[in-house]
Amino acid sequence: MVNRNPKRSDEPVWWGLFGAGGTWFAMLTPVTILVLGILVPLGVIGPESMNYLRVAGFVTSIIGALFVIGSISMPMWHAMHRLHHGMHDLKFHTGTAGKIACYAAAALATVLSVVFIFMI
């Protein structure tokens, strides 16, 4: 028989954030590391393009703020989802408390990144 009142799961929400975070981490984080961690220190990109006023101007624009918030929060959602399911795979059955702790840490990182961006 078909269950007419199936129990709803919140897992699609977490899988969506997991997928978005993984995509962000795979596509945008390497480029960010290349530019900020390799090309600027080697002088390929001039230091005048990364002075405080230009970087602060970028971060305070809407696209820059969204980029910084995404760079902090999206990989965090990915990592916390992976940690939650990794604990389950390793037979650390923390139940709802572990789930809440993992996703609360990701939510806290997201909220703090938004707060700190608006403080600039």
Curated annotation (Swiss-Prot):
Q: Which UniProt keywords apply?
A: Cell inner membrane, Cell membrane, Membrane, Transmembrane, Transmembrane helix
SUPFAM superfamilies linked to this entry: Fumarate reductase respiratory complex transmembrane subunits
* Transmembrane regions listed in the UniProt entry: 25-45, 55-75, 100-120
**SUBUNIT field:** Part of an enzyme complex containing four subunits: a flavoprotein (FrdA), an iron-sulfur protein (FrdB), and two hydrophobic anchor proteins (FrdC and FrdD).
What NCBIfam families does the database record attribute to this sequence? Answer: PRK05470.1-1
Q: Where in the cell is it found?
A: Cell inner membrane
Q: What is its main location?
A: membrane
Membrane topology category: Multi-pass membrane protein
Q: Which GO terms describe its molecular function?
A: succinate dehydrogenase activity
One CC-aspect GO term: plasma membrane
The UniProt entry's sequence similarity note says: Belongs to the FrdD family.
Pfam families given for it? Fumarate_red_D
For whether the record's keyword set contains Acetylation, the answer is no
UniProt keyword Membrane, yes or no: yes
Q: Which InterPro entries match?
A: Fumarate_red_D, SQR/QFR_C/D
Q: What is this protein called?
A: Fumarate reductase subunit D
Q: Which GO terms describe its biological process?
A: fumarate metabolic process
Function per UniProt: Anchors the catalytic components of the fumarate reductase complex to the cell membrane, binds quinones.
